[in-house]
Amino acid sequence: NIPGCNRLAYFGTSSFDAGVVAARLLSDRIAPEADILVGSIIHRGDGGSNQCRCREMGFRDYLGRAGFRGRLLGASLRLDDEGYNRRVLDELFEENPRIAGAVTFNSTCYILANYLRSSGHDGVRLVGYDVIRRNREMLEAGVVTALVAQRPAAQGFHGVMALCDMLVSGRRGPSDNLMPIDIVFRENVRFYNSHII
């Protein structure tokens, strides 16, 4: 949801609140003084998306209100450079042995999950976003603790329907249409079908 873009309609989650949900999921599973790794996995360029920034704001806001006393440790990782990522993360974990949680704010938490699994950091709780195939595999394997999901097929369906209503009948519906924030665990992922509208 990008303010000021003259959109017909937005169908999706509140990114800020999705960040709050991730913080709650993670902070309920680690000690208040434990450190959290914030993995920024760069797809292109050097900045994250508006959605990722809003998720991180919600995450930080919740931790600030919840009595979190640990540190948030950032790591900028690369989408297609496993060697670089390993060097960055090895150094970060060596210098910060109190890391007990990790989060990514885009759909590529499997990159961080691969590192955690291969480097023996089994105790780190990882929360990510979106039930894409590789994230789902890591969730089913128990490497990812939880995924925050947003029903992309339903978003697309409702968006196309809003466009059809506008083009066919001239009706313009509400511009902001917030959808549920789904929490997916290893135990319920087999029931999660994002294509059900």
Regions found by a protein language model. Name each.
Residues L37-V38, R60-E82:
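Short beta-strand elements in bilobed, periplasmic/extracellular small-molecule ligand-binding domains
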Residues N1-D17, I132-E140:
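Flexible loop/hinge segments that line or gate small-molecule binding clefts
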Residues G45-M57:
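Glycine- and acidic-residue-enriched helix-capping/strand-helix junction motifs
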Residues D46-G47, L63, R151-I197:
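Hinge/cleft segment of the Venus flytrap/periplasmic-binding protein
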Residues G74-R134:
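Hydrophobic alpha-helical
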Residues F11-I36, N85, R151-V168:
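Hydrophobic alpha-helical segments within soluble ligand-binding/sensing domains
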Residues L8-A9, D35-G47:
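Short beta-strand segments enriched in small/hydrophobic residues
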Residues V38-I41, V103, V184:
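Short hydrophobic segments within beta-strands
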